[in-house]
Amino acid sequence: HIEVGMGKGRFLMDLARLHPDINYIGIEMYDSVLLRALQKREELEENGEVYSNLFFMRVDARLLPEIFEKGEVDKIYLNFSDPWPKARHAKRRLTSREFLARYDQILVQDGKVEFKTDNKELFEFSLEEVEEAGWNLEASTFDLHHNEEMVQGNVMTEYEEKFSSMDHPICKLIAKRRCLL
């Protein structure tokens, strides 16, 4: 499982702790952000926590198909990604058709993308892109924390906690890779 744009890494650290049988890779393109995640992990490990199933990589997400083999990744998490609000930057959005095509190259046959955001416009864009790319939308909600089914097992990110505490609804979608016969 990978998280693209992992930020400080807490989400993946929580998942790695909950599921020691699954390997997690955090992808981050900014050195300063990656350094903060490494420091946080080191601090937790000094207190006795073990993260043998957690790895971090400094890489641009556009290069994912060059790093991972076809069918190597089970799940991709996109949490509170930069919305790139200007129309001319739409291809930079991590839920654009261009990025979905990259994910399609590395996911297993029934691989999934899970996306969370507080940005309704980005979420609506993402729903359209999933459909246009021919992916199967397994589930979606404009208010995760009031959707009993989708909130089950939810691991919150730092941004999610912050925005939820301010009563901002959190949007979430789960898209399944398009089936190629």
Name these PLM-found stretches.
Residues 4-7:
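Class I SAM-dependent methyltransferase "Motif I" SAM/SAH-binding loop
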Residues 9-13:
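Glycine-rich SAM-binding Motif I of class I
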Residues 30:
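Conserved SAM/SAH-binding beta-strand->alpha-helix loop
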Residues 35-40, 125:
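Short alpha-helix adjacent to the SAM-binding motif of class I
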Residues 39-71:
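S-adenosyl-L-methionine
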Residues 95-109:
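A short glycine-rich, Lys/Arg-flanked "PGG" loop and its adjoining helix->strand segment in the class I
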Residues 110-117:
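Conserved beta-strand signature within the Rossmann-like core of class I S-adenosyl-L-methionine
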Residues 126-128, 132-181:
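Class I S-adenosyl-L-methionine
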